[in-house]
């Protein structure tokens, strides 16, 4: 790595501007020799990529605690011109939680694609889970990747599904999203019971071109070209939609020809309202406008094939597409004009030649229209039927068409039979029936139904039912085989019943007896009466939209030496379906006291327990108080001012918080309801991961003058709070990534990495994100303010002294992940810039107008927290930082090992014991988090602080050591 970098000083390195063609400025990295050896190679690429963004000034900067992140490296700093430059969510903060490269991601077209290949197919719609509607779909926002650690988590469910991923990747359970590393055997997870078919790259063969429409008006061709439907190639991005619309139209659609003064040609679709709504959604994706839904109720007289007559009240629903161009398009694809019962037609040749997943869409559309739904008699599925009727002279055409369907189904390992049924009025009717349990299961799991929500949901549940029925039968088959083996060895039935391998709800004494006494054949085994009937299964395991509950059977750590990937989506649900399983998808404050180490040490256990009780912590932790949605807007726009006004702090607190705890550009109307709801329930909580609350003592003072001004002396007890904007900040980032990506394209910004999605700062999109991000910063400050209030109350509870008398004043509060409007001197002139600090801290010098007057003589306090069991540093800002790093310095120790690797190496109890041996009381909502945050997982905070000090971008004032710590 040193051969790439140019040495500037002992602790400063330059990444040359010619490292990458697109770089507008060099990279500047602050590292000593030891930290340089620990640097991940991918970080150089991220530094270079940031240097390629428009409007960047001087350098793309990396702090001593730098490590790999999303878009920007964590520990990255960059300043962009406010008029010519950009703002990027990736430069503020975002998490990556990952799955293995071979995870199968289900798409809206019913096929799955390996996760590692998904980054090449970002225009796909993927399946997601909506708690109110069930199955939905979403555009892809991004696909991120990172290198894996040695071990990852593999979970296996009772139904045989397997998912592999990092320990921090969330999986949907009945209790919400839980990281894979925190799942337990026996936990229930939500799965989508559909396997689909593997994606196959279509050819670029032309299906239709202008020559097919040469006889028609040029407006027909223009209409289709404008919508990307001419020329129509097999690899058209909407070919799946086109195939399933055509399939449905062969069943419940028609091309109507009206002969009047002016000949009209239009397409009509028929079905239930919900069905037509879904069809209309697909048509919109093609740019085709459909009519409103026409409905009418009428009485019809029905006479069946056996001569019975009856009257029925029914509702007819239909939509029309009045475009003649679309009608001709569907006709050229193979759909007949006029009544289908009077027409000769076959399966279109292009469908026969298409990839399997395209055929799947055609068949799913056809069966969605005319196929019968899954029905059970006790435990057994009845055949799934497709019936066709035509006039007598078209009998051969019916048979030809159904035989073509039969051949298509066979490609999916689905057996079917065709037979004649009774018909009326000189017509002939034939039925194709999918028969046999295995074939029915294959149909439901590989094809299923499209557009008919009722058929689809029942079909999904039926598929899962048959899967689990097979598993139950397999258990009984193995029992029969094993019982025979043991019986031959002299083991009695009574002895077998006591063995663990025979303890299963589907194994009975009678089954074992029949196996050994009656020589029951394995292939003759029937399902146990303990197995639920289909309706009972739905009641017990069904979830809205055809999703089902599955139980984790096994969890293990496995070795994995390839990349891990994650998917971001546009929709608010922020999940996707991998291997059928639904998966998901700050700052620091120093508070001083007038207590000494000796005064606190005797009560440290009680104090930590009290703090743990009073300050909510842990993954998904929620605040103590409940707030209305309207109050959230006040929090987002007022920050700490709101908290103090509501009684959570002292008026003087505002003076010792960066920006007085409120960015004035915040506008809550730019924050989504989803983000607000996530923030509303979490306000006043610590969270999880590297967020913590630590009771410390000042071990050593390096700068007596600055320490005295900050109110710090040796042996004094202080409290460090490290937390941020919780789920709200993450949600804001997610909400704006897609907007920024589109904006980058619209403004002609070439991105070296899609994770650096951005927009010009002064653009509408840039300002919208900035206002929302300011809300996130205000929320984080308010969150730390409320925690400060409960810290003060906890000290009062334990020491029986008022917080005011304990002099529990804020030394300073500074943000870590933020983009801010600032003025800096560049090339001798004052320039307005937007400074991105991602995992970096502001470090303004003496006499800067943005810092408290009390600190003018020494500069802004800088807080660099260490990891559990090690030191933290209080430092001060400098003029060198203003000149070199836009007034920025490091924000902490910086991870050296990922959470997944830390979990592999250490156990939470072990870390807790080691801390106790050092005299540190540690409490956490999760033992896994204790392991993730093991001291060895981080770079040396001493090396980070030394590097900053040597570089002059912040200077040491004091070093603090922990007495007790609370981890989320």
From Swiss-Prot:
Cell cycle recorded as keyword: no
InterPro entries: Hint_dom_C, Hint_dom_N, Hint_dom_sf, Homing_endonucl, INTEIN, Intein_C, Intein_endonuc_central, Intein_N
Cofactor binding note from Swiss-Prot or TrEMBL: Binds 2 manganese ions per subunit.
Annotated active site: 891 (gmp-histidine intermediate)
SUPFAM superfamilies registered for this protein in UniProt: Hedgehog/intein (Hint) domain, Homing endonucleases, Hypothetical protein PH1602
Catalysed reaction, written as an equation: a 3'-end 3'-phospho-ribonucleotide-RNA + a 5'-end dephospho-ribonucleoside-RNA + GTP = a ribonucleotidyl-ribonucleotide-RNA + GMP + diphosphate; a 3'-end 2',3'-cyclophospho-ribonucleotide-RNA + a 5'-end dephospho-ribonucleoside-RNA + GTP + H2O = a ribonucleotidyl-ribonucleotide-RNA + GMP + diphosphate + H(+)
Biological process (GO), any one: intron homing
Residues annotated as binding Mn(2+) 2: 586, 722, 816
Listed cofactors: Mn(2+)
Residue span(s) of domain DOD-type homing endonuclease: 245-414
EC number(s) given by UniProt: 6.5.1.8, 3.1.-.-
Binding annotation for GMP: 690-694, 816-817, 865-868, 872, 891-894, 967
Residues holding Mn(2+) 1: 95, 586, 691
Family annotation (PROSITE patterns): INTEIN_C_TER (PS50818), INTEIN_ENDONUCLEASE (PS50819), INTEIN_N_TER (PS50817), UPF0027 (PS01288)
Alphabetic keyword roster: Autocatalytic cleavage, DNA-binding, Endonuclease, GTP-binding, Hydrolase, Intron homing, Ligase, Manganese, Metal-binding, Nuclease, Nucleotide-binding, Protein splicing, tRNA processing
Any GO molecular function: GTP binding
Annotated signal sequence range: none
Methyltransferase is among the record's keywords: no
SMART domains found in the cross-reference section: HintC, HintN
Additional notes on this entry: Ligation proceeds through 3 nucleotidyl transfer steps, with 2',3'-cyclic phosphate termini being hydrolyzed to 3'-P termini in a step that precedes 3'-P activation with GMP. In the first nucleotidyl transfer step, RtcB reacts with GTP to form a covalent RtcB-histidine-GMP intermediate with release of PPi; in the second step, the GMP moiety is transferred to the RNA 3'-P; in the third step, the 5'-OH from the opposite RNA strand attacks the activated 3'-P to form a 3',5'-phosphodiester bond and release GMP.
Role: Essential for tRNA splicing and maturation. Acts by directly joining spliced tRNA halves to mature-sized tRNAs. Joins RNA with 2',3'-cyclic-phosphate or 3'-phosphate ends to RNA with 5'-hydroxy ends.
Subunit structure: Monomer.
Family named by the database record: Belongs to the RtcB family.
Full protein name: tRNA-splicing ligase RtcB
Organism, as annotated: Methanocaldococcus jannaschii (strain ATCC 43067 / DSM 2661 / JAL-1 / JCM 10045 / NBRC 100440)
């Amino acid at each position: 790595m040193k051969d790439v970098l140019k040495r500037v000083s002992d602790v400063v390195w330059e990444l040359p501007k010619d490292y990458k063609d697109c770089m507008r400025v060099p990279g500047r990295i602050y590292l000593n020799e030891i930290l340089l050896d620990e640097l991940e190679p991918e970080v150089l690429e991220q530094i270079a990529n940031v240097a390629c963004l428009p409007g960047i000034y001087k350098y793309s900067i990396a702090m001593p605690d730098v490590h790999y992140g999303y878009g920007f490296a964590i520990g990255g700093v960059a300043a962009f011109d406010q008029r010519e430059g950009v703002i990027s969510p990736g430069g503020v903060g975002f998490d990556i939680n990952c799955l293995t490269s071979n995870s199968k991601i289900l798409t809206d077209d019913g096929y799955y694609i390996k996760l590692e290949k998904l980054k090449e197919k970002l225009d796909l719609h993927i399946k997601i889970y909506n708690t109110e509607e069930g199955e939905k779909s979403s555009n892809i926002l991004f696909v991120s990747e990172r290198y894996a650690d040695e071990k990852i988590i593999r979970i296996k469910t009772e139904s045989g599904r397997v998912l592999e991923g990092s320990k921090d990747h969330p999986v949907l359970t009945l209790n919400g999203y839980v990281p894979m590393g925190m799942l337990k055997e026996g936990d229930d997870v939500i799965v989508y019971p559909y396997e689909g078919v593997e994606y196959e790259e279509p050819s670029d063969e032309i299906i239709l071109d202008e020559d097919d429409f040469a006889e028609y008006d040029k407006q027909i061709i223009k209409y289709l070209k404008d919508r990307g439907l001419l020329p129509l190639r097999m690899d058209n991005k909407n070919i799946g939609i086109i195939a399933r619309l055509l399939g449905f139209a062969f069943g419940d659609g028609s091309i109507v020809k009206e002969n009047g003064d002016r000949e009209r040609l239009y397409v009509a679709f028929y079905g239930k309202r919900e069905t037509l709504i879904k069809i209309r959604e697909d048509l919109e994706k093609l740019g085709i406008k459909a009519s409103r839904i026409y409905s009418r109720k009428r009485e019809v007289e029905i006479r069946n094939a056996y001569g019975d007559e009856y009257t029925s009240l029914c509702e007819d629903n239909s939509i029309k597409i009045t475009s003649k161009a679309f009608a001709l398009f569907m006709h050229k694809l193979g759909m007949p004009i006029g009544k289908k019962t009077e027409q000769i037609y076959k399966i279109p040749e292009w469908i026969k030649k298409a990839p399997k997943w395209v055929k799947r869409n055609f068949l799913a559309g056809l069966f969605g229209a005319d196929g019968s739904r899954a029905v059970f008699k006790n435990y057994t599925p009845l055949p799934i039927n497709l019936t066709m009727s035509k006039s007598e002279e078209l009998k051969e055409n019916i048979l030809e068409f159904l035989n073509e369907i039969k051949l298509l189904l066979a490609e999916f390992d689905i057996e079917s039979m065709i037979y004649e049924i009774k018909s009326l009025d000189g017509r002939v009717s034939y039925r194709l029936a999918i028969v046999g349990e295995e074939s029915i299961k294959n149909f439901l799991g590989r094809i299923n139904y499209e557009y008919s929500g009722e058929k689809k949901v029942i079909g999904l549940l039926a598929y899962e039912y048959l899967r689990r029925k097979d598993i139950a039968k397999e258990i009984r088959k193995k029992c029969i085989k094993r019982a025979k083996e043991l019986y031959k060895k002299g083991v009695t039935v009574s002895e077998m019943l006591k063995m663990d391998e025979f303890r299963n709800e589907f194994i009975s004494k009678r089954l074992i007896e029949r196996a050994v006494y009656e020589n029951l054949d394995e292939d003759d085994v029937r399902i146990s009466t303990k197995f639920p009937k289909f309706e009972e299964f739905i009641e017990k395991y069904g979830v809205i939209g055809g999703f089902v509950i599955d139980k984790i059977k096994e969890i293990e750590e496995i070795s994995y030496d390839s990349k891990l990937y994650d998917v971001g989506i546009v929709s608010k649900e922020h999940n996707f379906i991998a291997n059928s399983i639904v998966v998901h998808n700050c700052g620091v404050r120093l508070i001083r006291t007038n207590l000494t180490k000796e005064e606190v040490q005797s009560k440290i256990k009680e104090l930590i327990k009290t703090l743990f009780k009073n300050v909510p912590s842990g993954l998904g932790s929620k605040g103590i108080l409940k707030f209305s949605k309207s109050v959230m807007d006040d929090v987002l726009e007022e920050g700490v001012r709101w908290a103090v006004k509501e009684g959570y702090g002292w008026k003087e607190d505002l003076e010792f918080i960066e920006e007085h705890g409120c960015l004035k550009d915040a506008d809550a109307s730019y924050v989504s309801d989803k983000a607000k709801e996530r923030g509303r329930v979490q306000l006043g909580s610590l969270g999880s991961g590297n967020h913590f609350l630590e009771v410390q003592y000042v071990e050593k003072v390096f700068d007596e003058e600055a320490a005295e001004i900050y109110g710090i002396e040796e042996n004094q007890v202080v409290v460090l709070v490290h937390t941020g904007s919780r789920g709200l900040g993450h949600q804001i980032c997610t909400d704006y990534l897609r907007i920024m990506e589109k904006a980058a394209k619209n403004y002609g910004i070439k991105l070296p990495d899609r994770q650096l999605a951005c927009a010009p700062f002064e653009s509408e999109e840039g300002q919208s994100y900035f206002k929302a991000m300011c809300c996130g910063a205000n929320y984080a400050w308010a969150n730390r303010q409320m925690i400060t209030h409960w810290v003060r109350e906890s000290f009062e509870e334990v020491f029986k002294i008022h917080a005011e008398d304990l002099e529990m004043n804020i030394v300073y509060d500074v943000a870590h992940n933020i983009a801010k409007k600032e003025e800096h001197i560049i090339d001798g002139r004052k320039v307005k810039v937007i400074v991105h600090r991602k995992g970096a801290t502001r470090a303004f010098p003496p006499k800067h107008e943005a810092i408290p007057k009390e600190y003018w003589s020494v500069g802004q306090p800088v807080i660099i927290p260490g990891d559990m069991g090690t030191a933290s540093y209080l430092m001060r800002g400098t003029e060198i930082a203003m000149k070199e790093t836009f007034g920025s310095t490091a924000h902490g120790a910086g991870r050296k090992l990922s959470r997944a690797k830390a979990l592999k190496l250490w156990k939470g109890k072990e870390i807790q014991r080691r801390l106790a041996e050092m005299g540190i009381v540690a409490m956490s909502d999760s033992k896994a988090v204790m392991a993730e945050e093991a001291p060895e997982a981080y770079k040396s905070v001493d090396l980070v602080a030394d590097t900053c000090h040597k570089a002059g971008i912040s200077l040491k004032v004091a070093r603090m050591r922990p007495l007790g710590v609370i981890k989320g």
